[in-house]
Amino acid sequence: MKIRPLHDRVLVKRQEVESKSAGGIVLTGSAAGKSTRGTVTAIGKGRVLDNGQIKPLDVKVGDTVIFNEGYGAKTEKINTEELLLLTESDILAIVE
């Protein structure tokens, strides 16, 4: 199955979180937490402005991003991968 985001939506594959603490202790389960970094796997065409024009997104496929998993974030499981469907405004930064 393939997902094609609409408008200003972005599909992100969450990166694995580091499973060791700074002191070398292996973290498991909820102690490890969830990463707020991921790789953009698909994007919509852009945000529709009030005048009807489409503003292209600032992110592109392959970008590593830091995101805020807020109220509007949707989690989708495709095959064995867990993907997040976010709006571009949920993305806080592009990691360069």
From Swiss-Prot:
Note the superkingdom of the native organism. Answer: Bacteria
Q: Which GO terms describe its cellular component?
A: cytoplasm
Q: Which GO terms describe its molecular function?
A: ATP binding; metal ion binding; protein folding chaperone; protein-folding chaperone binding; unfolded protein binding
One Pfam family here = Cpn10
Recite the UniProt keywords alphabetically. Chaperone, Cytoplasm
The record's subcellular location field reads: Cytoplasm
User: What SUPFAM superfamilies does the database record attribute to this sequence?
Assistant: GroES-like
Q: Does the keyword Chloroplast apply?
A: no
Return the Gene3D superfamilies for the record.
GroES chaperonin (2.30.33.40)
| InterPro entries given in the database record | Chaperonin_GroES, Chaperonin_GroES_sf, Chaprnonin_Cpn10_CS, GroES-like_sf
Q: Write out the GO biological process terms.
A: chaperone cofactor-dependent protein refolding
Family to which this protein belongs: Belongs to the GroES chaperonin family.
Subunit architecture: Heptamer of 7 subunits arranged in a ring. Interacts with the chaperonin GroEL.
> What does this protein's UniProt record list under function?
Together with the chaperonin GroEL, plays an essential role in assisting protein folding. The GroEL-GroES system forms a nano-cage that allows encapsulation of the non-native substrate proteins and provides a physical environment optimized to promote and accelerate protein folding. GroES binds to the apical surface of the GroEL ring, thereby capping the opening of the GroEL channel.
In Swiss-Prot or TrEMBL terms, this protein is called: Co-chaperonin GroES
